[in-house]
């Protein structure tokens, strides 16, 4: 009898899967987008020549996103970068976060627009900003993330200046001091 009941349920399984598949297809029909729609995409590697500053008690009230901020004394580096890894080992950091103190940092980069960008959508694509992150362009906050293991796209288009330099500023924080299952790192890491 037990074998008959199991066989009966196994026969019904494909019916349930088929019904669920049909329900999914009704809700989200496939859209065919011709490849030529993507032919005009241009990718620019933006990883080099960033400025970085760790937030400290002395500078924590600074408007790091301001386009007029003098960042000439900041450290120049290339991305990806993990600022928490550079911090000293400390017991107060807690074992759950790799014995590193929680901290915040800012990245900045100035750039002119390419004349070919005018009239086009310009996206800055981050693979990950750990752990919390905000992106500013010319002093305006344009994107945020509260989970660094997912990518973040920041649409620069409405905020770009085509007449001069643009300043992108990225805030990254390792988040509040609380438990974690592993060392998370901090910064623009991919």
Which stretches of residues belong to each language-model region?
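Accessory beta-strand-rich segments of carbohydrate-active enzymes
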Residues: 21-37, 44, 53-55, 97, ...
